């Protein structure tokens, strides 16, 4: 089975980073000020914290890959170069994950290009999950609980 793992809101705490830096728009509630994010460049992404429970869960998923139980990939959407660079820097600083297995697409919907009957996507957003499922892939919605998410992965492996 191929397991594709989102980054923002799944592995890394995007909301905490935006909040810590005060990068919310003043004119619209709960909207990110992308001009500020882009002005900060790669550092915005590279300096994010792990989301609660993600570091241990990621280590378990990597161990499962080493045992040949699954193929693990990062599948993250970002539409500007400094964001891609920052996400790569984050992976290099915080993991031993091979950058060749990190895939970056422009839009969340583009993740559906990787959908297949043996492919699973863990993501926190419907705008990524729904197109992936519609394209024939399998989805696990991340709801902030890595223990439950890992249980869902193990359950999915037993189905294959």
Ranges and model annotations:
Residues 6, 75-77, 122:
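Short hydrophobic segments within beta-strands
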Residues 86-96, 131-135, 153:
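Short, aromatic/basic amphipathic alpha-helical patches
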Residues 120-153:
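Acidic, Mg2+-coordinating phosphoryl-transfer loop and its flanking beta/alpha structural elements
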Residues 102-132:
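Conserved Lys-Pro-Asp/Glu-containing loop-to-beta segment of HAD-superfamily phosphomonoesterases
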Residues 48-50, 54-91:
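Substrate-recognition element of Asp-dependent hydrolases with the DxDx(T/V) motif
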Residues 12-14, 20, 68-72, 81-85, ...:
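Short catalytic/ligand-binding loop motif for oxyanion handling, primarily in non-cytosolic enzymes
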Residues 1-45, 134-135, 147:
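Active-site neighborhood of HAD-like aspartate-dependent phosphohydrolases
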Residues 73-82, 88, 96-113:
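A short, structured active-site edge motif that brings together acidic residues
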């Amino acid at each position: 089975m191929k397991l594709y793992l989102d980054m923002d809101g799944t592995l890394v705490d995007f909301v905490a980073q935006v909040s810590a830096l005060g990068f919310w728009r003043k004119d619209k509630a709960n909207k990110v000020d992308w001009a500020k994010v882009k002005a900060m460049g790669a550092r915005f992404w590279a300096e994010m914290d792990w989301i609660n429970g993600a570091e241990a869960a990621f280590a378990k998923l990597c161990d499962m890959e080493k045992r040949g139980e699954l193929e693990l990939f990062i599948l993250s959407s970002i539409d500007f170069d400094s964001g891609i660079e920052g996400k790569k820097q984050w992976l290099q600083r915080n993991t031993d994950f091979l950058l060749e297995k990190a895939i970056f697409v422009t839009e969340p919907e583009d993740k559906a290009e990787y959908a297949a009957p043996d492919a699973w996507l863990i993501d926190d957003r419907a705008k990524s999950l729904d197109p992936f499922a519609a394209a024939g892939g399998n989805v696990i919605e991340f709801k902030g609980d890595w223990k439950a998410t890992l249980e869902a992965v193990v359950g999915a492996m037993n189905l294959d």
